[in-house]
Structure formats: structure tokens, C-alpha cells
């Protein structure tokens, strides 16, 4: 999924903006001609990349830019999201209950995925739950249309042109049909909300049907999330982090992902577990995360915390993924 986002939107899953996709034709003849020229260039690039003329025609011949996509991409947030507010909306009782249901329903599959990739099943469930509520909300935009619109619109043309080409390669490979290739307005796709380039790097066919189907195949979804984390540096058998209590007098400058201390050093600074007990003996380095600053909740983040952030570069997101996983598997 890894797409640049602004302000508090960096803490939101990619499917957060799920407005229905409506084709909007260019407003004047010059724009229409410009878009046709853009599509001609995409077709030429696609042919050079080995994409069939049939796929290029099916995907691009009737395509028009979608102004709703442009509106959502340009929309600026009106406030800064606090961790307290983010937690209250993302870690709902309903989401946790649904996660426990999925953990029970897919227990054998999760064990197989965990054994194959060495990634903690709780974190896999946390990402699945946070991205699309376990597949319930995958986004309603056609990915080809969305990425083509943003590549043509120009503000991040090179980024989205690469995503458009990657999406065309997915169609050419036969993993999914164009009508089913649905996602967010920015092109994040399916249940794990992979960007097309991420799909081509990390998506796997775990159910053995010959297609990497992150829209409808739960085995492919869970294994693809695990593969993403594994290839991002996941440390097998290590936790993501833990809730903690930091004294109100602690120097705020020691907090942050850049500062890594041993648990013994954190203990000497007065940090305890979230239940008030002493920190355990462990060789793992940890960073103190204060998502709402001094006086708010505190977390000790281990190296796997930063691996989760490679899925979405937000402390809020990584903490929420870890907490959902912990609560679902408790």
C-alpha cells in the first residue's frame, strides 16, 4: 500500500475514502484531447513492457478522468488527529470482536501462513482489520481509472504512472479482471490495500489457483500481508512492542523511534510495563513512543514496530495494528 499521504491521513488505512467512483468526462475539448494523448502514450509504454493489445484496449479505450479522484487527492485535512481520537475510532469493540471471529474461523490457515513466513498472526490480523475491516470495505474506485486520472492530472504524475503501468501488468498476468480491480481513490487495492507496485512485489498465490487474488481469496490476502512484512525485515519470534508507563518527569527528548535503549536502561529512567510491573530482561532494543506527547499513553516499540511502519509510515497505525493483534489473540 505505501503511498505518500498528508498530515493525519498518514494514520488512516488506504480504504478510508471509499466514495463511489463516477466517470467524469473532461470539461472541454482541449482537456479531452490532452487525455487522449496521455492514453496513447500509456499504450505505447505498455506495449514496450509486453502488455497485450487486448488488455490495453479493454483497460484504456473507453477510459475518462474522474474528477472525484482528483478532488479527494487534493483535499487538505482540516485538523490534526490525536492518538486518543484515532484509538477510539480504530480500536472499536466491533473491530476487535470481528477480528476474534476471523482468528477462530481461519485458525488453521493462519497457522499455515505463520509457519510459511514466520510473521505473527496477530499482526497479520491487525493489518487486515485496520485496512479494510477484514475485507468488508475495499474501496469503490476502479484502480485503472484512478491511477490513470492521477497520472494524467500531473501533481504526482511519475508516481501514479508507475502505479498505472503496474496495474496494467496485473491485468495482463490474469490475476484479476478490470471490473473487479477495485480499490481506494489513490489505487490501493483489495483487502490488504496494496498499491499495484506493491502487489507485484509482495502478493502471493497461497491457495494455488494460479492467481494472486487479494480481493476475494483469504489465503492469498493473509499470505500476501505476511510476505510484505517478511520482505520488509520482519524478525521472527519477536514482539512488535508493548504498552508502558513513563513517568511524567521523563525527558521528552529521549522519546521517539530514533532513540533505542535496552529495557534495563528504560527501567532506570522509570519506565514500567503498562500494568505497572517491572520491565522484563530482554536483549531487544526499544524506543519509547509517546503518541500524544508527555502525560499521555506510552509504548515501548521493538524493531518489528518499524517493519509495520513500512506498510504504513505512521506511529498511530503501527501501534493500532499491534494492539488489535494483541487483543484479538488474547
Where would I find each of the regions flagged by the language model?
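N-terminal secretory signal peptides and thylakoid transit peptides that target proteins
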Residues: 1-16
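Sec/Tat signal peptide C-region and signal peptidase I cleavage site
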Residues: 25-32
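An acidic, Gly/Ser/Thr/Pro-rich helix-cap/linker signature
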Residues: 33-105, 111-114
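Non-transmembrane alpha-helical segments in soluble domains
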Residues: 43, 168, 226-229, 322
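Surface-exposed patches in mature extracellular/periplasmic domains of secreted proteins
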Residues: 51-60, 120-126, 179-182, 212-213, ...
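Acidic/His-rich structured neighborhood in mature extracellular/periplasmic domains
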Residues: 88-217, 222-224
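Flexible, glycine-rich surface segments
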Residues: 178, 185-190, 195-278
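C-terminal soluble interaction/assembly domains
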Residues: 250-330
